[in-house]
């Protein structure tokens, strides 16, 4: 019964399950669900990141897209790709960035060899705690160049700085998640798609919250108190979706000077 299933998920949170119209033995189906892979500890970014360096030059091609003002290239950004959405790259080009894309498993020296003005850390799938190679790389880059992270990139920054993440009982999915901007007390409607979050009580003293989810009070954004580093859990580049937070790309450009 669909209603019974919804009630169970609402009370107990997201869980593994099997839907079948072939095998009808309940015991076998339960065992299949139990033996299926879990998201916890899964480094899925390895499966979707590119194998080699590339460049990205395409900005917005639709003249009706006006939420970021076109700007001539003034900054060089290295984007670490853990499964990046292409509209993020378009947004970076739109604000005046020459973009070099590197695989998410590159080293900090690989990044610095490109002599970027700023570093972008992308979204991607899986458990952020499992992407340990990225924790190391990012920790070595903090303070060297301005850094901006989105979604998984936000979570990886947290780990690199000593914080931790946890699996949400109910993942944030959809394009109407309300987020409070703590700097101006304005509410932004955001697009979100994540099952893990950064533990706010695990943030080191060097990091401070900037955005909070109004549905469950979880952390949605943070910044470094003294260094040019910021990140958000949601998707300011959403396509399609709300553009209340597109200013973050311009804030990143301003961080680069």
State each model region's role.
Residues 2-115, 128, 239-241, 251-257:
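RNA-binding accessory domains that recognize and position tRNA/RNA substrates
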Residues 221-257:
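A glycine-centered loop/beta-turn motif at secondary-structure junctions
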Residues 113, 118, 122-200, 241-255:
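Cysteine-nucleophile active-site neighborhood
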Residues 99, 147, 229:
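Hydrophobic anchor at the start of a short beta-strand
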Residues 76-81, 190-191, 230-234:
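Active-site-proximal beta-strand elements of phosphoester/diester hydrolases
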Residues 185-227:
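Catalytic beta-strand/loop cores that center a nucleophilic Ser/Cys/Thr
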